Amino acid sequence: MVALSVVELLKEKIRQEGRVISDDVLKVDSFLNHQIDPVLMLKVGEEFARRFAGSAITKVLTVEASGIAVALMTGLSLKVPVVFAKKKQPSTMDGETYCGRVRSFTKEEVIDIVVAGSYLGPEDRVLIIDDFLASGEAARGLLKIITQAGATLVGVGTVIEKVFQTGGEALRDQGIRVESLVQIGSLAGGQIEFLN
């Protein structure tokens, strides 16, 4: 029996456990962003490490909370630290900070994300990792933080890209390398259309 690739494993998991909420929203909270399948997430992290091998990555960056599991497994596979942007600056975060503004598609709110200056710097080569890529808001907010830190963006890795929401296209048009494990072309009529 041939082992399925991580992409095929993800697609199968989405088919079995994913739920289309609307033409724009896919619910995958049973394995990705509420309850987490750690074995699958480790395979996802290993796949991102494979795809970005040779990029001299020094940090993996994500936004709390849904991206943390994927980012952690990617950092583990790359053997580099993981930094997550906080959605609220804690009172314990002092010194220089880097901030970005993000509009959450599913929560319909605008939030300011923040990273302590001591965790990102000009010497860093950063890989952004997240669970979903839709409008690209989270990636753009994290890119602002990377720019403020004087660090270098290596690329963006996302588990699921909703291609019909054009965030990935906009990032690619800026010359940013985007690696999406699963690309979805449509959720219309409650049907998941995979592009890869």
Curated annotation (Swiss-Prot):
Q: Which superkingdom heads the taxonomic lineage of this protein's source?
A: Bacteria
Does Glycosyltransferase show up as a keyword for this record? Answer: yes
* Gene3D superfamilies given in the database record: 3.40.50.2020
Q: Which SUPFAM superfamilies match?
A: PRTase-like
Q: What does this protein do?
A: Converts the preformed base xanthine, a product of nucleic acid breakdown, to xanthosine 5'-monophosphate (XMP), so it can be reused for RNA or DNA synthesis.
Oligomeric form and interacting partners: Homodimer.
Family assignment from sequence similarity: Belongs to the purine/pyrimidine phosphoribosyltransferase family. Xpt subfamily.
The protein's name: Xanthine phosphoribosyltransferase
Supply the gene name: xpt
